[in-house]
């Protein structure tokens, strides 16, 4: 217990440090003292003098909301990836395997093609979120036989349906005008640029409500890792728990994808690294994954802003640059050790 608390406390302090550094560092460097004063002034309890008034919109309306979006999205993606890996007993899958990313992409491109994105900033998130849930439901239904969800069938169904949906998305893309194409591509690459407080609060409520539910199922996930027969003997309703967990994963990932675009590898590499550090006990791993995922995406967003400053790289490109080499290393390691992916957890 002490180790877990200390490790999570370390992650929390690290996250606060990254947030503060991200607020003052960028194309325009804002003194740390001014950053703190701006935040305190916004509480309405203080009225400190800021050295430059131009710092206020930069810190509070440009950087702060996108950073907070990175916190909830990174945390949610890592939490869902960790849960999915434990549920399927496979360390190289994440929540995207159940079709959420492909469904969200289809919803986004439909919204853009219909010209609806100019009416509200929430149109694309709503369309992408709705289609993500629909495609996830279809994949879950296909992979369920006689009331039982087969892990391998779920993965294969996810790959097949995602490929089909991706083909439909590509067909629609060919009919888009150049400006519409750019709008979709920028979203699809995964970007936090232009995220406002509205986006943060749009995602905050479901993340705050649903994440603790997954934390609660840590014990049940540990039991499921022992095998279905053992789980049944211990009184676990496998169908009910698995269904609830998959629904929560679909909702959390859909919310994350629809407000940030397709950001890859967060849900894959963060839980895997943590397993090496603190073990596979989901009761502590799930909470640590949320905090570590928030740290990872917030830091990646900082890199996306400063690597080619004043130009900006999509944060999805940064996570891919970091995550892809590690993923390749992981596959090579598993291959050398001769392990079977569905048996190694």
Q: Where are each of the predicted segments found?
A:
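Alpha-helical transmembrane segments in inner-membrane proteins
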Residues: 1-345
